[in-house]
Amino acid sequence: MDRSLQVYICMYPYLDGSKQYRFDELISFYRPCPKSLDNIKSHYRQIHHQIRRRTHQHHQIRRRTHQHHHRSNCSRQRQCLVRHSCGRQMRVLA
């Protein structure tokens, strides 16, 4: 992974709810880390789609009890927090 660009993405928690996926944990399962911000969105969408497929049944169960409580928070757009080596942070809608 390119350490000059550390990327942490808010994604689905692990199924036991213990923690959230970290971007550099995910890329070891899928494909090499994108080297530029231009590639992060499309890369994130691919990972997001694969995880959605794998956890679809789990989310169908959770959605029945969860959706009416936080309907506005359950949008499909998730925010990526991009942290550069210089300390600058920016949020990217994926």
From Swiss-Prot:
Sequence repeats lie at residues 48-57, 58-67. It comes from the Eukaryota. Signal peptide: none annotated. Keywords: Repeat. One of its GO terms (biological process) is amino acid transport. Induction: Repressed in presence of ammonia. The keyword Repeat applies. Involved in ammonia regulation of the GAP1 permease. This is Ammonia regulation of amino acid uptake protein. It comes from Saccharomyces cerevisiae (strain ATCC 204508 / S288c). The lineage of its organism: Eukaryota, Fungi, Dikarya, Ascomycota, Saccharomycotina.
